Amino acid sequence: MAPKVSDSVEQLRAAGNQNFRNGQYGEASALYERALRLLQARGSADPEEESVLYSNRAACYLKDGNCTDCIKDCTSALALVPFSIKPLLRRASAYEALEKYALAYVDYKTVLQIDNSVASALEGINRITRALMDSLGPEWRLKLPPIPVVPVSAQKRWNSLPSDNHKETAKTKSKEATATKSRVPSAGDVERAKALKEEGNDLVKKGNHKKAIEKYSESLLCSSLESATYSNRALCHLVLKQYKEAVKDCTEALKLDGKNVKAFYRRAQAYKALKDYKSSLSDISSLLQIEPRNGPAQKLRQEVNQNMN
C-alpha cells in the first residue's frame, strides 16, 4: 500500500525513493508517475527534475524485468538532460538483458567518456566486449552504431555534481581489484587484456590520454597481472595531472614487478608534483640502484634537490 503523501513533487519523489529502497518497486513507480503528472501539469520547465523522475521510474521497471519500458523512460530522461550517467547505465543494463549488445556497448562507452572510472560501466564493457567478439567476430567494432562524443561541458557538469554515482566512483579502485584479482585470468582474458593494452598504447601515441585510460582500465578488468598496464595508465594520469592516481597505479605496478623502472620514475614524478620530495627521492634512489646511468632519473633527482633547497 502506497503511503499517503501530499501533492508535492518533492514529497512524492522522496516517498518513491523510500519504497524503492524497501524493494516495493511497483509502489515506487506509481509515486514517480504521480510526480511526473504533477510536474507536467504545472507547465513549469524543470528538465532536471523531470529527467530524474523518468530515470527513477526506469530503475523500477528494470528491477521488475520490464526492460522495454525501462529503455523508454531512460531515453526520455536523456532527452531532457543529455549524458546523465544513471539513465545511461540503466538503459545499458536493459539493452544487455535483451541481448542488444551493440546498443548496450554504446551506452556503457558513453558513460566512460563522462567518467572513465565508473566501475559498473567498466565491468559492463568487459562483459559486452566478450559477447560482441563471440557473436560478431574480430571485426565487431566496425558493426557498432555511432558512439556519441560527450562534450566537455557534460563532463564538467558530472564532475561537479555531489551525486550517489560519485560514491560508486570513489569505490572504483577496490571494485576493480575485486573484479580482477579474485580470479585467475583465462587464456582468453589474457589475450583480450593484451589487445586492449595495445589499443591504449596507440591512443597514447595519438595524445589521447583520457581514452587510453579507459582502454588500460578495461585491460586490467580482463587481467590484473600486467605491471606495464598499470605503469602505462600512470603515465596518462601524470599527463592529466591526476598525481594521486598515478601514485596508486605505480604502486600496483611495483607490487607485480619490483624492478619496473618506469613505475619508479613515474611515481617519483608524481611525488614531486605533490611536493612529497622525500618519497620522490626514495623512488629515484631505488631506480638508480637498478639503472645507475639512467639520465632522466639523474636529472629528476637534481630538480627535486633544487626544490628542497
Curated annotation (Swiss-Prot):
The keyword Membrane applies. Residues 158-189 are annotated as: Disordered. Disruption phenotype: Mice are viable, grow normally and both males and females are fertile. There is no effect on spermatogenesis or protein import into mitochondria. Residues 164-178 have a biased composition (Basic and acidic residues). Its main location: cytoplasm. The keyword Cell division does not apply. Disulfide bonds: none annotated. SUPFAM superfamilies: TPR-like. TPR repeats lie at residues 9-42, 51-84, 85-118, 193-226, 227-260, 261-294. It is found in: Cytoplasm; Mitochondrion outer membrane. InterPro entries: CiliaryAsmbly_MitoImport, TPR-like_helical_dom_sf, TPR_rpt. Interacts with HSP90A, VCP, ATP6V1D, KIAA0665, AMPK, and DMAP1 through its TPR repeat. This is Mitochondrial import receptor subunit TOM34.
